[in-house]
Amino acid sequence: MHAPRNEKEARPEVVYLDNNATTRVAPEVFEAMVPFLTEYYGNPSSAYGFGKLVEGHIIQAREKVAALVGATAKEIIFTSCGTESDNMAIWSALQTTGKRHIVTTQVEHSAIMNQTDQLERMGFGVTRLPVQPDGTLLLSDVENAIRDDTAIVSIMWANNETGVLFPVEEIASLVKRKREEFTKANPRNKGPFFHTDAVQTPGKIDLRHVAKSDIDFLSMSGHKLHAPKGVGVLYVKRRTSVVPYVIGGGQERGKRGGTENVASIVGLGRAAELALEKLSDEQVRIRAMRDRFEETLLQRLPHLYINGKRDQRLPNTSNIAFDFVEAEAILMKLDVAGICASSGSACTTGSLDPSHVLSAMGLTPARARSCVRFSFSHYNRDTDIDLALEIIPPMIEKLRAMSPLGPDHTDNFNYDVEAAREKEEKLMAATMAAINE
C-alpha cells in the first residue's frame, strides 16, 4: 500500500497486523495532545506561570506512566525513544561501576545489539547468551556469564519478533544476588545492574509489580502502546545511580538534557492510563484472536510452524514459518490485499540476512526467510482475522505451486532448499542478462 500522494487522496484502507512495529495513536491520546500543539506552547522550564502550567501537565503524565510499572514519579525519566532509553541504561551502568563487561542475549533488539557491537569495538567485553530452539533462555547461562567485572546484564522482557517472554524478574533477582556477593568480597564494588528492554510489553502484560522487583532499569517506548512516536521512558529504580546520556540543560532533574516533547509526553501519560484500563479484558480477547488465527492456519496449511514457545509469548504476537515460500513474496501479496504484516523487526528492514533472532533459535536460513510476523492490537476485530484467513491459505498454496522451493520440487526442505535457491538465483541472473542484451 502506498502513502497518499496529496491531501485529497484518501487514506488506503488496511488490515493492520503489524502492531509490534508501531501502533495507531489512540483518539483519546491525540485529543489529550492537541492543546499542547496549539494553545499551551510554553517552555516547561520557564519561570513564569505559562511555563509552569505546562510543567504541571508533564508532572501529571509522569505520575500516570509511573503507575504503569507501580513506580513513583521520581523513578521515571522521559527520553526520545526506546533506543535512547536502552543506550542510556547501558551507558550509565558502565560509567557508574567503572566495569567493562556486559551480558546480553543473541536475540535483542538492534538498539542493544548495535550498541554492544560498538562498545565491543571500543574494547569492552560482551557476552551474548544463546537461546533454546523455542526462543527461551536458560537461567543457568545467565548466572554463569556474570563476572566480577560485569557492569550490567541487559535482557529484553519480550522478543519483538517472536513474542517470547523471558523471566526477567528472576534474572533481576539473580543479578542482585551476584552484586551482593561481589560487594561482600569488596565493599567498594558497584554492579552489576539489571536492565530490561520492555518496549513490547506495556498494555500486553501487567507491569505494575516492576517497582517491587529487583529490576534496576526498564525501557519503554510511546509508539508501541498507542502514543506517538518520538517519546520514550527509562525507569530507574530508586537509589540506583544514573548518568546523563544526552547532556544539555537541567531537564528531567538533570538526568536528560533537551527541552521536553510536551505534547508527546502528555499523550504517553494518557496512553498509560488507557493501557491499565483495558489490560485485563483486552489481553484475553487479543490472545483468543491470535490463537484462532494460528489454529486455523495450522488446520488449513501443511508445512507451517509457529516460532517460539507457545505458552510463553506475548498474547498478541505470532511468528509463522511458511515453508517453501519467501516471506518477501508473502508480504508483497498481503500488501496488495491491504494486509500489513512484517518479516521481522521494522528497525532492520532492508537487510538481506535472515533474522538474527530466528537464526539464534536454530532455524535454517531458508526457513528463517519464510517467516512472517503478525501482531495484533485492541483495534483489531474478528473481521480482520476472518479476512486474513480468507486470503492467506490460497495465497500460500499458489506461491508454493509457483516456487522452485516448493514441496513438489524438493524432498527435504531443510537440506535441499539452498540448492534450489541457488538454482533459482542462477535462472534469474540468466534471465536478467538476456533482458539487458
Task: Spell out what each predicted region is.
Residues 1-437:
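Pyridoxal 5′-phosphate
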